[in-house]
Regions:
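Signature of dsDNA virion morphogenesis modules
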Residues: 1-202
């Protein structure tokens, strides 16, 4: 399906090793642990690596000036499951797949249920669990491991990002947080102001 517009959400993949084959967010080891696939015997499946990470901040603008609200996040989060993970958005460089998706608190990464999220207007995270294929691209999995080593020049250099396509949008004016911004949905007013958007050179 073709979309008129695309944007990318990005979050640092700050991880630590919880077993020889599993990685999870360093800042919140216990909080994101339930997202790491636990129905896989990593000792038997030595070619797999389990990973958990925050994928995007909701209700806050990304570096492109784009943002996603709570209702949109809820609508699309489950659609991450079973999607492939790749390198640099190259669909020919698949290195794993998403196996779980959820939400976590911004800052602490404490997991939240969908009902709790529905009432939130402040920033929170979409959090994902994935399985990576070690043998498909050993250089990539080694890069992940090196990103955990504080003495490596690759330390904390890995980030997770995902591209979103959409055909329409509204404007949020006045704040970097959606909850504090004025929402403009009138097509004529959007047309007048869209030149100020980064995607239009503003």
């Amino acid at each position: 399906m073709e979309y008129k517009y695309t944007t990318t959400f990005q979050a640092p993949l700050i991880s630590c090793e919880i077993s020889e084959a599993s990685l999870i967010s360093k800042a919140s080891l216990e909080n994101l642990a339930p997202l790491v696939p636990d129905n896989i015997d990593y000792d038997e499946n030595v070619d797999l690596m389990g990973v958990a990470f925050n994928a995007a901040v909701i209700n806050q603008f990304n570096k492109n000036g784009d943002g996603m609200d709570t209702s949109t996040a809820i609508k699309y989060t489950d659609k991450f499951i079973h999607k492939p993970t790749n390198i640099e958005h190259d669909k020919q460089k698949i290195v794993g797949h998403i196996v779980s998706a959820g939400y976590s608190k911004f800052g602490s990464s404490e997991l939240m249920g969908e009902e709790e999220v529905r009432a939130i207007k402040e920033p929170f995270n979409i959090s994902l669990g994935a399985v990576l294929y070690k043998t498909i691209n050993p250089n990539f999995t080694n890069l992940i491991k090196n990103s955990l080593d504080s003495e490596s020049d690759k330390y904390q250099k890995v980030s997770a990002s995902w591209e979103v396509g959409f055909n329409s949008y509204v404007l949020a004016v006045g704040s970097d947080k959606l909850s504090e911004a004025r929402i403009i949905s009138d097509p004529e007013e959007i047309a007048k102001l869209q030149g100020n958007l980064r995607s239009y050179g503003g």
